[in-house]
Amino acid sequence: MNVFWFIPTHGDSRYLGTAEGARAADYDYFRQVAVAADTLGYDGVLLPTGRSCEDAWVVASSLIPATKRLKFLVAIRPGLSSPGLSARMASTFDRLSDGRLLINVVTGGDSAELEGDGLFADHDTRYAITDDFLHIWRGLLAESHENGGIDFDGEHLSAKGGKLLYPPVQRPHPPLWFGGSSPAAHAIAADHIDTYLSWGEPPAAVEKKIADIRARAAARGREIKFGIRLHVIVRETQEEAWRDADRLISRLDDDTIARAQQAFAKMDSEGQRRMAALHGGKRGSRQELEIYPNLWAGVGLVRGGAGTALVGNPEQIAARMREYAALGIETFILSGYPHLEESYRFAELVFPLVKGGGNTRRAGPLSGPFGEVVGNQYLPKASQS
């Protein structure tokens, strides 16, 4: 089981929908979260993309020297940048990080934002552009440096003599990750993608998506891995966890929720539509927002994209993760508020249950975790409870 964390380049806070308890989205904080994820034993981090956050490539590049083993899941944007430029960026990053790059293919589901960036295309056309883009991008990274270049004549994008002089460390190219819930998205996944990502829907819905993509990929002679994107609120007791879930949305008012839901409703993203359907745009009771045992839809009231959280004590969180893993999920991309503190909580409380230990760094005999020395003489004992 692989566990990733998240770099909150769109800001961080103790509460949703208010400036109260907010933290500056600056390099010092991004570095703190990245170093914590690296030293705690997370396998990688996701960096978000879009106008609501700092540029993922610039931030990820700045974090390479601050980390040792952490992988970076960074977005390429078909239709917003050329496949040639994106291929060179990916190869350089992979070389400078010694093979620590993972690629998140983001077609985009907010037509207003995309038009603001200069892309005027409907939903299915955007996925057709993505298909052309990935044919060229993969060819450039996999083979163009070994021959005279690649040619591709697509419906929307073409290349003639495309060549990449500096190959990536990971061959044939850094692994491709991708999420999308529409039939057009599933077709892209089956044709091109190494790991398909689902947002945190109930297990039955995730299982259905996995089955469809597996069947499509098998028909093309391919196998695909699967991951899931979730928030997490883990505490020593379930009562504490649910209390903090309620606290996270305690500053939300009806107007803030309504404005967020109106913005989401204008998108043509099938995944966003499915997220919104889980809570109906209304702030309800815990029972109404707990859409499956320990799966809470409160985050999606005002946050776009991943809108559900696993909430509970360590054993409950681990049980839900194993339930998803039984469906074929290999990678969990998690986040929590505030991201620095929650990264420690999850690693300390849940890693021993799902990864076989807490801090997975190679360390000397006196490296922790062991807590503060007792009486200036003794290392503290392990819990007897």
From Swiss-Prot:
Q: Which reaction does it catalyse?
A: an alkanesulfonate + FMNH2 + O2 = an aldehyde + FMN + sulfite + H2O + 2 H(+)
Q: What is its EC number?
A: 1.14.14.5
Q: Name one GO biological process term.
A: alkanesulfonate catabolic process
Q: Does the keyword Oxidoreductase apply?
A: yes
Q: Name one Pfam family in it.
A: Bac_luciferase
Instruction: Supply the alphabetized keyword list.
Output: Flavoprotein, FMN, Monooxygenase, Oxidoreductase
Q: Which Gene3D superfamilies match?
A: Luciferase-like domain
User: Which molecular function terms from Gene Ontology are attached?
Assistant: alkanesulfonate monooxygenase activity
CDD domains per the UniProt record, alphabetical: Alkanesulfonate_monoxygenase (cd01094)
Q: Any idea what job this protein has?
A: Catalyzes the desulfonation of aliphatic sulfonates.
What protein name is recorded for this chain?
Alkanesulfonate monooxygenase
Which organism is this protein's natural source?
A: Burkholderia pseudomallei (strain 1710b)
